[in-house]
Swiss-Prot record:
Catalyzes the transfer of 4-deoxy-4-formamido-L-arabinose from UDP to undecaprenyl phosphate. The modified arabinose is attached to lipid A and is required for resistance to polymyxin and cationic antimicrobial peptides. It is a multi-pass membrane protein. One of its GO terms (cellular component) is plasma membrane. It comes from Klebsiella pneumoniae subsp. pneumoniae (strain ATCC 700721 / MGH 78578). This is Undecaprenyl-phosphate 4-deoxy-4-formamido-L-arabinose transferase. The chain crosses the membrane at residues 236-256, 270-290. The gene is arnC. Disulfide bonds: none annotated.
Amino acid sequence: MLTYPPVKKVSVVIPVYNEQDSLPELLRRTDAACATLGRQYEILLIDDGSSDDSARMLTEAAEAEGSHVVAVLLNRNYGQHSAIMAGFSHVTGDLIITLDADLQNPPEEIPRLVAKADEGYDVVGTVRQNRQDSIFRKTASKMINRLIQRTTGKAMGDYGCMLRAYRRHIIDAMLNCHERSTFIPILANTFARRAVEIPVMHAEREFGDSKYSFMRLINLMYDLVTCLTTTPLRLLSIFGSVIALLGFAFGLLLVVLRLAFGPQWAAEGVFMLFAVLFMFIGAQFVGMGLLGEYIGRIYNDVRARPRYFIQRVVRQPETASKEEDRS
């Protein structure tokens, strides 16, 4: 079995978007959890274009004497996964842990992820126990997880939980990928030799509301589908062929019924023809929408614009020099 050197430094990456209410508690609990590790650590918080006071609070936390906080400030909102990738580009640890800022995944679980990674795993995922989300979110999450498992063939139980640990070589491999639409847990698993999941607690959200609106969830679903595989395009071709065969068979049926019963049956077939027409139009719009998603993402990749723009990085002088040496 492939072995890795002991983890000397842990980097915790946390995307932040309008989380000023939860930041003091997040910083306190995360720092306390990391202090129990008995090894070096840093806490990178990426401000994803917040409109509240989050950026100022992160800057002050990073500038405080003896702070382990690194503040990465983006110029605007790019989305959770792009913000995490921005954090990945500035980590100095050899084990990287991602964590949400809403405290629904307790920072106190960090030592358990580090201990599991020490057993020789490239990726340590988590499965939320007693999940404190709405029925809609739970149902959507189960459907997406099943879709991912069927498509990738990897039986990971909870791809939606961002409390995860990654070895440094996994992070470097992901940073070498240049697609604009990225879903980090899936991308990481494509590079992992050994991956495992552990159960973790899931708490109710104490501060603010979820930053994932219905439209953001829809966009995330499209990211999942299009970044995984081109299978939907093949299914679209199969679906179109089935519709064409059904249309041909139904056309023959209409001819037979007309010959048997005359033009008077079913209002001379007007309603049935409308039903068939709407079925075909609906199928065409589904196909066009799916093709449009793929073409739009190809267009974004061809433009080769950066997936994020870092406006400022605030860190302690000694850690800044180490980060420059690594670069």
